[in-house]
């Protein structure tokens, strides 16, 4: 009788040979018996099946008729289908409110009690606010927050408090999943907008926490990474709602209560770009590379030189060359009159970048001249005196060191060392300092003449020349960071940096393999040398190559390293071996052959694959990576801490002297009665300005939030998910319309009535 509920299947066109044979007609070896090993529930009656089917189809009158005619009580309203769903659960899933009200009227309230079924879709510790946040439902969260709901604060992964220890001991998986659910709730854009006064700052902090959690709980790495990306995209989308430069200025210059404040900059209404610096600190590449943010940065970068971008290429080149040639004159003009119109133009970040670059190119030119003016007569002097060009180089080095010291003072050690450019500058300046210090020591201690081959291997002059060579290499490599400003060379420079990081990972594996084979070959051949002359043979520099190259650890390392580049012509089989050395030669050949396979073939190809992956990763996000790196470089020129380039920055400027006198006078006046009153008025003015800025920020943030919500609603209406929801609503409306038509026509049956037993 129930067969009519399902569409019939026509098997007339199917041959009997294509159908599976019954177990009775086949041997036991040809069939496999199937048995349901799961929990077997009691079979529902016909009325119960019709009852659940009517609830699923939204047939209000069929459900009402079944409930009204259930006088004998043979209908179990708590019955469930094959999926374990009862009538109320099915009705809630289909959002049939009229049927749900009908079920509640007929005594189904007990079905609405807290469900203790382990097969339910959510765990018992998931609150409604968590589910609403998971769905990112702004309206439901608004209603729930009016009821003063609360969320448990997630503890750290390694927390050893009593509660965490008890939960871990009881069920560690459930504890980890609950922490993930809490963070999925906290990362909801709707919840962040409703509960946070500064949604952008909260998104930054939350993404950093999630990134750290992904490294600790590697089992849920993908989940935490996706949540961190969600927070980053939310901050980016919120910034994208800004419609003018004024709103961008308010957002990017906002300083939270936890950040240090620049009181002088606040009173002078200077741009500190605190929020942008914070975004770079939290590695918010999506936020920094957003179009609105980049356009605002371009405006600040060029400043009063805004017309430079619209000039032809030839005029741009002429402008850069003119500034690059006359940079000493421009520096002196700024040193004398920093507040003049000409001084303000020089203070523009773009002009500062060109002047600093020209100063550094001059320093590199002096390094080239150093090798050209080298005095051959002092070649064998053990302690040569410093030349004039040495003193010029020392001035530049002192200026660069002073610039690094100022940056270290204002940024802090942690932020200073995070920049690879600062690390390279620190190493380079340290090498130059050590070079000239050793030269001074050698000049004061040694006054003799002797051939260089007779000098001690660690003579101060020789060590100074070696350090100077390394410093020169780093000086030219420092030019790579200037490529960041170019849209063509910038992505290549970023890719090279990522490749160097991957090469460091590869180096750990390669050194282990090299050390392993070096130990084996050294132990095999350390007693095989025949004479002292052959024992002195090291590396690939032997005139008579033999396996005596492997007699020492250092020699074996050199040989195996150059073997990768086919530069170590090492004899694997000794042609002049005596009786009993065949096994030794064979074992050596096997070890070297294995090394060739592992390193030359496998590890080398692995390195190529890693470098290719790194390059492709940067290429896939080329625009984002380049704009983020360029913003980091630009920000270093936005403040007024290092306006003058080396060596002019070591000269005390009138501006610095005025600041020192002003600070000293304020300190002296602060101990007088008038000074204290003036200081109180200044603090009051500063607080009023800070409060006004905070109020403006909240107004702008409210506008951004409302625009973001409007944008999200428009996107939801154009997605497939919104289409499905609209179809469900249409289905419910049609069901209600059908029921109303039946009510008007007095028709109380449905298409399933033929299967219901009549009275």
UniProtKB/Swiss-Prot annotation:
Main location per the UniProt record: membrane
Pfam families, per database record: Ank_2, Ion_trans, TRP_2
Intramembrane portions: 312-345
Extracellular compartment segments: 371-388, 442-462, 525-589
Protein keywords: ANK repeat, Calcium, Calcium channel, Calcium transport, Cell membrane, Disulfide bond, Ion channel, Ion transport, Membrane, Metal-binding, Phosphoprotein, Repeat, Transmembrane, Transmembrane helix, Transport, Zinc
Segments on the Cytoplasmic side according to the record's topology features: 1-311, 346-352, 406-421, 484-502, 611-759
Regulation: May be operated by a phosphatidylinositol second messenger system activated by receptor tyrosine kinases or G-protein coupled receptors. Also activated by intracellular calcium store depletion.
InterPro entries: Ankyrin_rpt (IPR002110), Ankyrin_rpt-contain_sf (IPR036770), Ion_trans_dom (IPR005821), TRP_dom (IPR013555), TRPC1_channel (IPR005457), TRPC_channel (IPR002153)
ANK repeat residue numbers: 46-75, 83-109, 124-146
Membrane topology, record value: Multi-pass membrane protein
Chain sites annotated for binding Zn(2+): 155, 159, 161, 164
BP-aspect Gene Ontology terms: calcium ion transmembrane transport; cellular response to hypoxia; melanin biosynthetic process; modulation of chemical synaptic transmission; positive regulation of membrane hyperpolarization; positive regulation of release of sequestered calcium ion into cytosol; regulation of cytosolic calcium ion concentration; relaxation of vascular associated smooth muscle
Localization in the cell: Cell membrane
Positions of the UniProt region annotated as Disordered: 1-30
Keyword Transmembrane found: yes
Disulfide bonding pattern of the chain: 537-542
Family: Belongs to the transient receptor (TC 1.A.4) family. STrpC subfamily. TRPC1 sub-subfamily.
Role this protein plays: Forms a receptor-activated non-selective calcium permeant cation channel. Forms a heteromeric ion channel with TRPC4 or TRPC5 that has reduced calcium permeability compared to the homomeric TRPC4 or TRPC5 channel. Also permeable to monovalent ions including sodium, lithium and cesium ions.
Protein name: Short transient receptor potential channel 1
Taxonomic placement: Eukaryota, Metazoa, Chordata, Craniata, Vertebrata
Recorded name of the encoding gene: Trpc1
């Amino acid at each position: 009788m129930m067969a009519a509920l399902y569409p019939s299947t026509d098997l007339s066109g199917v041959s009997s040979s294509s159908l599976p044979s019954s177990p009775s007609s086949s041997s036991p070896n040809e069939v496999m018996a199937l048995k349901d090993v799961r929990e077997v529930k009691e079979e529902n009656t016909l009325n119960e099946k019709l009852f659940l089917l009517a609830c699923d189809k939204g047939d209000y009158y069929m459900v009402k008729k079944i409930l009204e005619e259930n006088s004998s009580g043979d209908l179990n309203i708590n019955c469930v289908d094959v999926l374990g769903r009862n009538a109320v659960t099915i009705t809630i899933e289909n959002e049939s409110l009229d049927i749900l009200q009908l079920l509640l009227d007929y005594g189904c309230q007990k079905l609405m009690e807290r469900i203790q079924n382990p097969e339910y879709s959510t765990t018992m510790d998931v609150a409604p606010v968590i589910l609403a946040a998971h769905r990112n439902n702004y309206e439901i969260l608004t209603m729930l927050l009016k009821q003063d709901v609360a969320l448990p604060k997630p503890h750290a992964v390694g927390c050893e408090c009593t509660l965490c220890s008890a939960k871990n001991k009881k069920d560690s998986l459930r504890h980890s999943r609950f922490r993930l659910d809490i963070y999925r709730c906290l990362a909801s854009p709707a919840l962040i907008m409703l509960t946070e006064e500064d949604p952008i700052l909260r998104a930054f902090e939350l993404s950093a926490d999630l990134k750290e959690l992904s490294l600790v709980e590697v089992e849920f790495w993908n989940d935490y990474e996706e949540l961190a990306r969600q927070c980053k995209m939310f901050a980016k989308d919120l910034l994208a709602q800004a419609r003018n430069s004024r709103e961008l200025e308010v957002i990017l210059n906002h300083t939270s209560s936890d950040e240090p404040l620049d009181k002088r900059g606040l009173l002078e209404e200077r741009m500190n770009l605190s929020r942008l610096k914070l975004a770079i600190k939290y590695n918010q590449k999506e936020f920094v590379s957003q179009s609105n943010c980049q356009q605002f940065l371009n405006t600040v970068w060029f400043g009063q030189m805004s017309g430079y971008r619209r000039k032809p290429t030839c005029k741009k080149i002429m402008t850069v060359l003119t500034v690059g040639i006359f940079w000493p004159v421009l520096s002196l003009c700024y040193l004398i009159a920093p507040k003049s119109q000409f001084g303000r133009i020089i203070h523009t970040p773009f002009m500062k970048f060109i002047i600093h670059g020209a100063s550094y190119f001059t320093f590199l030119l002096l390094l080239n001249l150093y090798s050209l003016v080298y005095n051959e007569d002092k070649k064998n002097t053990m302690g040569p005196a410093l030349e004039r060009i040495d003193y010029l180089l020392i001035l530049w080095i002192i200026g660069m060191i002073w610039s690094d010291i100022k940056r270290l003072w204002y940024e802090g050690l942690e932020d200073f060392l995070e920049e690879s450019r600062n690390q390279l500058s620190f190493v380079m300046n340290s090498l130059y300092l050590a070079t000239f210090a050793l030269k001074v020591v050698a000049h004061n201690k040694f006054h003799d003449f002797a051939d260089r081959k007779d000098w001690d291997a660690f003579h101060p002059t020789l060590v100074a020349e070696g350090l100077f060579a390394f410093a020169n290499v780093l000086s030219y490599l420092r030019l790579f960071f200037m490529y960041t400003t170019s849209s063509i060379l910038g992505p290549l420079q970023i890719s090279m940096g990522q490749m160097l990081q991957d090469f460091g990972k590869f180096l750990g594996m390669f050194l282990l393999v090299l050390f392993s084979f070096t130990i084996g070959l050294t132990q095999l051949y350390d007693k095989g040398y025949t004479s002292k002359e052959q024992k002195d043979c090291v590396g690939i520099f032997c005139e008579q190559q033999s396996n005596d190259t492997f007699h020492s650890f250092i020699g074996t390392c050199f040989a195996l390293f150059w073997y990768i580049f086919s530069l170590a012509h090492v004899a694997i089989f000794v042609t002049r071996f005596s009786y009993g050395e065949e096994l030794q030669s064979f074992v050596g050949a096997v070890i070297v052959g294995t090394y060739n396979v592992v390193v030359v073939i496998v590890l080398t190809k692995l390195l190529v694959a890693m470098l290719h992956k790194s390059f492709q990763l940067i290429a896939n996000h080329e625009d984002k990576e380049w704009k983020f790196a360029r913003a980091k470089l630009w920000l270093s020129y936005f403040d007024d801490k290092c306006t003058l380039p080396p060596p002019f920055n070591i000269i005390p400027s009138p501006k610095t002297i005025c600041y020192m006198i002003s600070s000293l006078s304020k300190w002296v006046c602060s101990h007088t009665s008038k000074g204290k009153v003036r200081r109180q008025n200044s603090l009051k003015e500063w607080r009023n300005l800070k409060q006004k800025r905070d109020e403006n920020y909240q107004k702008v943030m409210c506008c951004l939030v409302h625009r973001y919500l409007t944008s999200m609603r428009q996107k939801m209406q154009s997605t497939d998910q919104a289409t499905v929801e609209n179809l469900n609503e249409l289905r419910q409306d049609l069901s209600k319309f059908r029921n109303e038509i039946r009510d008007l026509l007095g028709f109380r049956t449905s298409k399933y009535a033929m299967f219901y037993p009549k009275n």
